[in-house]
Amino acid sequence: MSQFWYSEETASRLAEELLQQAGEHGRIACLSAPSVYQKLKQLESVRSDGVSAVLLEFDRRFAAYGDEFVFYDYNNPLCLPEDLLPQSFDIVIADPPYLSEECLSKVTLTVKHLTKGKILLCTGAIMEEHAGKLLDLKMCSFLPRHNHNLANEFRCYVNYESRLLS
């Protein structure tokens, strides 16, 4: 498994979207999206909205974030700590590690468990049909970029009214 880091502009745009959608004192779950989580942490010092974020990630190097890090393996999608209560996050961003229906189906279980409703999915354009079928998501016009260009076209999908749609 490889880590693909979003460009600075993309990480910022996604973090701003999450903060807006979470609302004051909201909770954000970053599922396999460490570059967005890191951007949220960077923005913490200039915000006073009380928003909190948790990173669910397979790469244990991110355990350096302490209690805000949760080890996550999509193969065990509901193997989560008891303190991650069902529907306890105002918005969940997910970036599944693989472009496969199997992976997205498993990640979907986690997303549905965690979210109160709002979902922002970042994955390949080839997953559009599955994103719609599994999570009722619509493709955004916003084009996320990575530090290194990916071979696959990458897109964002949401289930709410978003500035990323236009």
Curated annotation (Swiss-Prot):
GO biological process: peptidyl-lysine methylation
UniProt-annotated location(s): Cytoplasm
Record-listed E.C. numbers: 2.1.1.-
Any GO molecular function: nucleic acid binding
Protein keywords: Cytoplasm, Methyltransferase, Transferase
Enzyme class: transferase
Pfam name, any one: N6-adenineMlase
Reaction(s) catalysed (UniProt annotation): L-lysyl-[protein] + 3 S-adenosyl-L-methionine = N(6),N(6),N(6)-trimethyl-L-lysyl-[protein] + 3 S-adenosyl-L-homocysteine + 3 H(+)
A GO term from the CC aspect: cytoplasm
Principal location: cytoplasm
Stated role: Protein-lysine methyltransferase that selectively catalyzes the trimethylation of EEF1A at 'Lys-79'.
Family membership noted in the UniProt record: Belongs to the class I-like SAM-binding methyltransferase superfamily. EFM5 family.
Record-given protein name: EEF1A lysine methyltransferase 1
